[in-house]
Amino acid sequence: MKVTIVGAGNVGATCADVISYRGIASEVVLLDIKEGFAEGKALDIMQCATNTGFNTKVSGVTNDYSKTAGSDVVVITSGIPRKPGMTREELIGINAGIVKTVAENVLKHSPNTIIVVVSNPMDTMTYLALKATGVPKNRIIGMGGALDSSRFRTYLSLALDKPANDISAMVIGGHGDTTMIPLTRLASYNGIPVTEFLSEEVLQKVAADTMVGGATLTGLLGTSAWYAPGASVAYLVDSILNDQKKMIACSVFVEGEYGQNDICIGVPCIIGKNGVEEILDIKLNDQEKALFAKSADAVRGMNDALKSILV
């Protein structure tokens, strides 16, 4: 199985590293526009093999998409962060151009690949990749919910003082600090609702911490996080390549699900060899429905900036 990761920065390289040492794919290609950068990252990862015991072939390439041919999954991490003085529309315009070009190039060489979008604003870039390429909706997946849910489980773990892997919890909605919806009502520890252990006040703080989880790390690190994002992408890729059919919150195209249409937004999905195998219909209460509708409106508003690109 072959995975291409476009963008050899911190998130892309971490994703390649995790995929390699976990043996998720037999081959990983890192591609970047910066001369020699992906090659260096790939060589560094390969030199871990004797210490970590993996056999994955990792290679790097500078902007040569022919080397990505035959990829089962392509991960797009390319894009720029928002800079001081830059409007939301300007950021979307620049990153949309990058994502569109990358998606078109990889599809020339891997027409049946499944594309995982990581670039921000993630829901809008996922929608752009879908609309610009015409790829079937099950093969375009935005990663955001996997990361947001991981952060939610981590904060619940800290509040409960219990292992995160014993906690089930999910975040739906847009991948943004005002649009995501941590489903505290449905979170559980070894099958027992966390509401049995944590007060409403604590749960509200956990939800709030989750929503600003990315911003918190940016404040501490001085740049965006990369370990958890890279691992979240690898987790998603693993479910695709090995047909694990895990339930993962992902940004996908909805057509009536949860009362929404013509947007990509985070919803619970079954992820397998065909990409999005199924969108699960979780019964939301009235408050959660209202929050989801508000989140969808915000995502739709972001998508408006794509109109000039998608004509």
From Swiss-Prot:
<feature type="binding site">
    <location>
        <position position="151"/>
    </location>
    <ligand>
        <name>substrate</name>
    </ligand>
</feature>
<dbReference type="InterPro" id="IPR022383">
    <property type="entry name" value="Lactate/malate_DH_C"/>
</dbReference>
<dbReference type="GO" id="GO:0004459">
    <property type="term" value="F:L-lactate dehydrogenase activity"/>
</dbReference>
<feature type="binding site">
    <location>
        <position position="120"/>
    </location>
    <ligand>
        <name>substrate</name>
    </ligand>
</feature>
<feature type="binding site">
    <location>
        <position position="82"/>
    </location>
    <ligand>
        <name>substrate</name>
    </ligand>
</feature>
<dbReference type="InterPro" id="IPR036291">
    <property type="entry name" value="NAD(P)-bd_dom_sf"/>
</dbReference>
<feature type="binding site">
    <location>
        <position position="95"/>
    </location>
    <ligand>
        <name>NAD(+)</name>
    </ligand>
</feature>
<dbReference type="Pfam" id="PF00056">
    <property type="entry name" value="Ldh_1_N"/>
</dbReference>
<feature type="binding site">
    <location>
        <position position="32"/>
    </location>
    <ligand>
        <name>NAD(+)</name>
    </ligand>
</feature>
<feature type="binding site">
    <location>
        <begin position="7"/>
        <end position="12"/>
    </location>
    <ligand>
        <name>NAD(+)</name>
    </ligand>
</feature>
<dbReference type="GO" id="GO:0006089">
    <property type="term" value="P:lactate metabolic process"/>
</dbReference>
<dbReference type="InterPro" id="IPR011275">
    <property type="entry name" value="Malate_DH_type3"/>
</dbReference>
<comment type="function">
    <text>Catalyzes the reversible oxidation of malate to oxaloacetate. Can use both NAD and NADP for malate oxidation, but NADPH cannot be used for oxaloacetate reduction.</text>
</comment>
<dbReference type="InterPro" id="IPR015955">
    <property type="entry name" value="Lactate_DH/Glyco_Ohase_4_C"/>
</dbReference>
<feature type="binding site">
    <location>
        <begin position="118"/>
        <end position="120"/>
    </location>
    <ligand>
        <name>NAD(+)</name>
    </ligand>
</feature>
<comment type="similarity">
    <text>Belongs to the LDH/MDH superfamily. MDH type 3 family.</text>
</comment>
<dbReference type="GO" id="GO:0030060">
    <property type="term" value="F:L-malate dehydrogenase (NAD+) activity"/>
</dbReference>
<protein>
    <recommendedName>
        <fullName>Malate dehydrogenase</fullName>
        <ecNumber>1.1.1.37</ecNumber>
    </recommendedName>
</protein>
<dbReference type="InterPro" id="IPR001557">
    <property type="entry name" value="L-lactate/malate_DH"/>
</dbReference>
<comment type="subunit">
    <text>Homotetramer.</text>
</comment>
<dbReference type="GO" id="GO:0006099">
    <property type="term" value="P:tricarboxylic acid cycle"/>
</dbReference>
<keyword id="KW-0816">Tricarboxylic acid cycle</keyword>
<feature type="binding site">
    <location>
        <position position="88"/>
    </location>
    <ligand>
        <name>substrate</name>
    </ligand>
</feature>
<dbReference type="InterPro" id="IPR001236">
    <property type="entry name" value="Lactate/malate_DH_N"/>
</dbReference>
<keyword id="KW-0560">Oxidoreductase</keyword>
<feature type="active site" description="Proton acceptor">
    <location>
        <position position="175"/>
    </location>
</feature>
<keyword id="KW-0520">NAD</keyword>
<dbReference type="Pfam" id="PF02866">
    <property type="entry name" value="Ldh_1_C"/>
</dbReference>
